[in-house]
């Protein structure tokens, strides 16, 4: 029943309203509005079925119902009131106009929804601190600060541009400068400028909703930067010994004030300016050349190393190695060069390559491996010299003993035996031994041992020693026995035998006697010929007429014996005249004899000799005897053949010799002129002459003796 009554009531109500007319209502209500400061704001309002009073309120304050809104000079209402149009206009809009506005139909009790009026204030052009030209130092971090001041609404956004390109926002940040003043903001751009940033343009733009295009402020960077250096070398690849020119170029703000050159960190003395000329060597490969350029801001340097081609240079030489027999040995050496050298190992004096590389290994060495090993480096480029270094391998082994040649010795004279010892390690002792004894050092009876270093060592066998065994007063047994020289060290013992050779005195004495006899004979022949010729020239007339004898008697005491040739005598008248010479030591006395005077005043003893000189006597009698007999036995060659020399004597009319030469008074007349060579005082057996082979028979008659 109740459900049926409700629709009926609604129908009746609708019919009643239709007869009374439409009620007042809003055809258009104001909406929120954003207006730039200084522009016009329009808030629309339209009512339907209302012909009463319409007014606007500002944040609840009624502005009035008249169209021109008295008291609000910048406000007015426009539109056809009959049509219900009541729009509110504000021009120019100011910041104080920002409020909430409502359109009200007072008599109908209608109020529109509130409309918020927002007044936008465009930002002013920002300011960059230090602009329009900002001076910075290249390489030093710096900040660019941009500020926007004023009552800009909303708060502006500050953006940075470089050469028209927006920079990343991560490089700057924005700060509100004053609370309640949204327009006062600041933006800081952090950057590290470089030399290429000199003259660059940076733009700070303040942008907001009030001014979407924003306002810009531009600045220019003026950079001070240390020198930027470029170092070049010409040529860059050279051979050792060639010239190289380094050129150091730099750009700087402010200008360059100085250059400094260095090589391997050490200053190059005398180098100034941007150009350096050098002669390349191997050190330029590992020691770069650097150029440092300075100005008021700072300094910068660049360095470069040359590609120097050079031959091998020894960096680590091989060290001597000493090992025992059977152990391994190794050598190592290091070379450098450009290009890298080829390293090989050989043995000194050999051509066989034992190995290559920096290390040579010799397994289980023996004594034959001892010696000098050569580490040789060959240049990797033709035209470059190689190099070599040596090291000695010493193989520790038992001593090596060698008997040295010893000179033969005379019986009962001194003798010496020597041996050479090489050993590594050095021998503990060197011992001489023979049948009945041994001696290491010092003396023992007739034996004396001396040991001293050898002048040279044999490669790889260790230092050398020479041990000498001296024997005084040799005996027959010394020439038949063996002498042993032995040496020992911690690895063993070595030895060698030496024997003593015997030397015969006779051949030497014979040679000396022959030479002395020949020399004496030659001198006497020359003297006789000279005397003959001289007398012949002085008394040729007298001697040609007379054939008397010139007789030289013995000494005044009459002790001299006369030979058969002296028995022929004559009267004083038969002998002819007495001849006196100025250059002879023979004086003819009144008795017809020649007296001998000592020309040496007694320094040499001249024994008296009686010689009969028969002038013109036929050969074969008196002074002229048969040719001398040889000094040796028949069938053996004589020491000196007198005949060839005496045959060369020119003929002398004084002697009228038919044989053509002067003979000796006795076959051994010249033996007394032989003077044996002294060989030292040997021990002689009792009753034995010192040199039995030099004791010649004494002639049976006196001989003329003098000193040669």
Swiss-Prot record:
Glycans are attached at residues 143, 301, 484. InterPro entries: CD80_C2-set, Cell_adhesion_signaling, Ig-like_dom, Ig-like_dom_sf, Ig-like_fold, Ig_I-set, Ig_sub, Ig_sub2. PROSITE patterns: IG_LIKE. It is found in: Cell membrane. A motif (Cell attachment site) lies at residues 149-151. GO terms for cellular component: cell-cell junction; membrane; plasma membrane; slit diaphragm. Residues 553-562 have a biased composition (Low complexity). It is a single-pass type I membrane protein. GO terms for molecular function: cell adhesion molecule binding; identical protein binding. Pfam families: C2-set_2, I-set, Ig_3. The modification Phosphotyrosine is found at residues 603-604, 661. Disulfide bonds join 45-103, 146-204, 248-291, 333-375, 419-485. Keywords: Cell membrane, Disulfide bond, Glycoprotein, Immunoglobulin domain, Membrane, Phosphoprotein, Repeat, Signal, Transmembrane, Transmembrane helix. The keyword Transferase does not apply. GO terms for biological process: cell adhesion; cell-cell adhesion. Gene3D superfamilies: Immunoglobulins (2.60.40.10). Residues 24-118, 123-222, 227-307, 312-394, 398-501 form the Ig-like C2-type domain. Residues 545-601, 684-708 are annotated as: Disordered. Residues 1-20 form the signal peptide. It comes from the Eukaryota. Residues 21-510 are extracellular. The chain crosses the membrane at residues 511-531. PANTHER family: KIN OF IRRE-LIKE PROTEIN 2 (PTHR11640:SF51), NEPHRIN (PTHR11640). Homodimer. Interacts with NPHS2/podocin (via the C-terminus). Interacts with NPHS1 (via the Ig-like domains). Interacts with FYN. This is Kin of IRRE-like protein 2.
């Amino acid at each position: 029943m109740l459900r049926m009554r409700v629709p009926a009531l609604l129908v009746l109500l609708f019919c009643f309203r239709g007869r009374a007319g439409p009620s007042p209502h809003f055809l258009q209500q104001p909406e929120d509005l954003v207006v730039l400061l200084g522009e016009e704001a329009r808030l629309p309002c339209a009512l339907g079925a209302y012909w009463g009073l319409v007014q606007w309120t500002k944040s609840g304050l009624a502005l009035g119902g008249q169209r021109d809104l008295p008291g609000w000079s910048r406000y007015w209402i426009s539109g056809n009131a009959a049509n219900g149009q009541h729009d509110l206009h504000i021009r120019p809009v100011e910041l104080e106009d920002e409020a909430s506005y409502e359109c009200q139909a007072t008599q109908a009790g209608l109020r529109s929804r509130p409309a918020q009026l927002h007044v936008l204030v465009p930002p002013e052009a920002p300011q960059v601190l230090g602009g329009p030209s900002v001076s910075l130092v290249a390489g030093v971090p710096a900040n660019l600060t941009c500020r926007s001041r004023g009552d800009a609404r909303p708060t502006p956004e500050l953006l940075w541009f470089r050469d028209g390109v927006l920079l990343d926002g991560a490089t700057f940040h924005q700060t509100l400068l004053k609370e309640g003043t949204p327009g006062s903001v600041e933006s800081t751009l952090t950057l590290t400028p470089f030399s290429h940033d000199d003259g660059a343009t940076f733009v700070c733009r303040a942008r907001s909703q009030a001014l979407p295009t924003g306002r810009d402020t531009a600045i220019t960077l003026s950079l001070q930067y240390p020198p930027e250096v470029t170092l070049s070398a010409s040529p860059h690849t050279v051979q050792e010994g060639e010239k190289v020119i380094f050129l150091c170029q730099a750009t700087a703000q402010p200008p360059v004030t100085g250059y400094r050159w260095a090589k391997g960190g050490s200053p190059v003395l005398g180098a100034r300016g941007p150009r350096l000329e050098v002669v390349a060597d191997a050190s330029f490969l590992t020691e770069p050349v650097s150029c440092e350029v300075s100005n008021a801001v700072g300094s910068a340097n660049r360095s470069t190393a040359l590609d120097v081609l050079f031959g091998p240079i020894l960096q680590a030489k091989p060290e001597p190695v000493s090992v025992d027999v059977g152990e391994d040995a190794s050598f190592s050496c290091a070379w450098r060069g450009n290009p890298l050298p080829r390293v090989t190992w050989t043995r000194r004096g050999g051509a066989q390559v034992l190995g290559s590389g920096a290390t040579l290994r010799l397994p289980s060495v023996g004594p034959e491996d001892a010696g000098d090993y050569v580490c040789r480096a060959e240049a990797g480029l033709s035209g470059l010299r190689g190099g070599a270094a040596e090291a000695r391998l010493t193989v520790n082994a038992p001593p090596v003993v060698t008997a040295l040649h010893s000179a033969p010795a005379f019986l009962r004279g001194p003798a010496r035996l020597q041996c050479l010892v090489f050993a590594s390690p050095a021998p503990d002792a060197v011992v001489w031994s023979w049948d009945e004894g041994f001696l290491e050092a010092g003396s023992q009876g007739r034996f004396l041992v001396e040991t001293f270093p050898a002048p040279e060592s044999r490669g790889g066998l260790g230092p050398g020693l020479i041990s000498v065994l001296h024997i005084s007063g040799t005996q027959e047994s010394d020439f038949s026995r063996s002498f042993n020289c032995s040496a020992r060290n911690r690895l063993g013992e070595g030895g060698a035998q030496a024997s003593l050779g015997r030397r015969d005195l006779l051949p030497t004495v014979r040679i000396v006697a022959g030479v002395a006899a020949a020399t004496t004979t030659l001198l006497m022949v020359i003297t006789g010929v000279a005397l003959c010729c001289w007398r012949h020239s002085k008394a040729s007339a007298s001697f040609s007429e007379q054939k008397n004898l010139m007789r030289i008697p013995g000494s005044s005491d009459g002790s001299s014996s006369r030979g058969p040739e002296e028995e022929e005598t004559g009267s004083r008248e038969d002998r002819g005249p007495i001849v006196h010479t100025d250059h002879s030591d023979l004086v003819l006395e009144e008795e017809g004899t020649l007296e001998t005077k000592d020309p040496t005043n007694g320094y040499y003893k001249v024994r008296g000799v009686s010689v009969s000189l028969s002038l013109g006597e036929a050969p074969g009698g008196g002074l002229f005897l048969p040719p001398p007999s040889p000094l040796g036995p028949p069938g053996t060659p004589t020491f000196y053949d007198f005949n060839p020399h005496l045959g060369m004597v020119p003929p002398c009319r004084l002697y009228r010799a038919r044989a053509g030469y002067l003979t000796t008074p006795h076959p051994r007349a010249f033996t007394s002129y032989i003077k044996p060579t002294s060989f030292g005082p040997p021990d002689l057996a009792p009753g034995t002459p010192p040199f039995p082979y030099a004791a010649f028979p004494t002639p049976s008659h006196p001989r003329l003796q003098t000193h040669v």
